[in-house]
Amino acid sequence: MKLLRIGEKNYEKPAILSKDGKIIDISSCIKDFNPDNLNFETISKLQSIDLSSLPELSSSERIGSCITNPGKFIAIGLNFSDHAAETGSKPPSEPIVFMKATSCINGPNDDIEITKDSKKLDWEVELGIVIGKHAKHISEKQSQDHILGYCLVNDVSEREWQIEKKGQWVKGKSHDTFGPIGPYLVTKDEISNANSLNMSCLLYTSDAADEQLS
């Protein structure tokens, strides 16, 4: 399934993109795609819904972030070898783990607010992984059973604040609007091999980034 949220900011409705491309309002079945509902039980429930009995939403309406109020927004730095080369860095031997504030989450097509005195605003297309159940101290193989689905994430950064001003990365990563997510949360069953996906980030009409995961 492709899940999305449609409507004005803070008033989005949860929806499903049907196989024939219609955006179906499922707000009568689920309140929102928030931590209370981002689980495998909810996905199973949604898969059994008769979409033909539910109202259609206009495709011209604003698309919000495909999830809202996640408990954590964890990211990995220098995750692509091409990006590491662009920055003059070697791929790290251990993952660089950092946090983005959940308050920076934004719709995929919403404006990005340029911070005051910003000189080095930057963007990175990333694959977001949505976790569907709690886990601690599990193996890499076991981790696959906890993935609910995938989404696109734009990891927006102010590089001067992030790197040149020293300290933790969060200050250059978490300004309001620095976390566009979506448009869709695609359930894991729809993607047989996430490593084969291609992702693109468009800046105006130019390809700002084009990455393959493998």
Residue ranges and their predicted role:
Residues 17, 130, 210-211:
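Short stretches within intrinsically disordered, low-complexity N-terminal or propeptide regions
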Residues 204, 208-214:
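Single conserved hydrophobic/aromatic residue that forms the stacking wall/gate
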